[in-house]
Amino acid sequence: YKVTFVRNVTDIDDKILDKAAAAGQQWWERAYIYEREFTEAYNTLGVEPPTYEPRATGHMIDMIDLIKQIIDNGHGYVVTDENGNPTGNVYFDVASWPHYGELTHQKQTAVADAASEVADAMGPSVDNAGNDKYNPVDPADMSEDKHDPRDFALWKAPKDSDPLDARWNTPFGTGRPGWHIECSAMSHRYLKDM
């Protein structure tokens, strides 16, 4: 078999921006350091090189187009301010996809509520720090903008601390890609005809 090996490079995300700021570096400089270290580790292990190795920042148009398609298909929503202007946040609406969570065994609301009752019968579900032991939600994923806490970011409005060159203008506001859309857009670009 002829294998097409795509190894995408996430060169823009919250962690890269935060680590770069803490180190006094440009975000793209920090991303390149991580990419180089990863490639060296792969080479040390003798792993075959990829057929394609796209960087997320080189595929912004692909990501924006895919987000538009997701919104047009009723699976995403743009957050707007009180005047109806887009804020830059776009989320995937998990409730719009009936099979969402099947692969990872996550439950939709009604089933999750029933599971919560069972968990409550098992004892306290919240630990001393206030974290839900049975259904943890990353605090970074919590937002009043979301319809459901499980909705995930397709596009993120910039934080005040984000550098100006880490922001892209889109029909849904200025921001940068969410982590999941990067992989999806690049996979579609390089593997759609496979």
Locate predicted features.
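NTP-dependent nucleotidyl-transfer catalytic core
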Residues: Y1-M194
